[in-house]
């Protein structure tokens, strides 16, 4: 029970922080336009109709496809989270699901995901992203690292 409550709290905190950051950045952008944080980082406004890196942004009915796909992935991860006995795995999955729900909320409300972090070196730009993308990526990396560690311990 404790694992479930903590997981739900983590999920909601991640989702809320994502939505708050997007609201704050949209207001900041409306007042100031693009903002240079430091030489390699700008805060911008980009509406991503595709998936990661803007892939498939021109896909016909893409938003509907991505919403359904997101919902299926969220359901699978939520089921996995419920079944896991590990608090750390549950928290990782909650971070991933919270980020995915944050981006899904954007798709439902705006028809696209709001990205605002632009990292670049000279003219080369990493695709813009947001806090939800960051939490999903970190959650996946930590989850995979835990799984690899678990498997190496089982094989030792």
UniProtKB/Swiss-Prot annotation:
Enzyme Commission numbers on file: 3.4.23.36
Transmembrane segments: 62-82, 126-146
Reactions listed under catalytic activity: Release of signal peptides from bacterial membrane prolipoproteins. Hydrolyzes -Xaa-Yaa-Zaa-|-(S,diacylglyceryl)Cys-, in which Xaa is hydrophobic (preferably Leu), and Yaa (Ala or Ser) and Zaa (Gly or Ala) have small, neutral side chains
Pfam families: Peptidase_A8
Keyword set, alphabetical order: Aspartyl protease, Cell inner membrane, Cell membrane, Hydrolase, Membrane, Protease, Transmembrane, Transmembrane helix
Recorded topology in the membrane: Multi-pass membrane protein
Family classification: Belongs to the peptidase A8 family.
Name of the featured protein: Lipoprotein signal peptidase
Protein's gene: lspA
């Amino acid at each position: 029970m404790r694992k479930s409550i903590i997981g739900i709290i983590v999920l909601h905190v991640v989702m809320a922080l994502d939505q708050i950051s997007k609201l704050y950045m949209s207001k900041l952008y409306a007042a100031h336009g693009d903002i240079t944080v430091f030489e390699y980082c700008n805060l911008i406004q980009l509406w991503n109709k595709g998936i990661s890196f803007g892939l498939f942004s021109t896909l016909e009915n893409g938003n509907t496809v991505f919403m359904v796909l997101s919902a299926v992935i969220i359901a699978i991860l939520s089921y996995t989270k419920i079944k896991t006995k590990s608090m750390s795995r549950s928290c990782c999955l909650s971070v991933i699901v919270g980020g995915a729900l944050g981006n899904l909320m954007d798709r439902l409300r705006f028809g696209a995901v709001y990205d605002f972090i632009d990292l670049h070196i000279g003219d080369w730009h990493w695709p813009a992203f947001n806090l939800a993308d960051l939490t999903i990526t970190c959650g996946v990396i930590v989850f995979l690292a835990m799984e690899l560690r678990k498997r190496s311990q089982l094989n030792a």
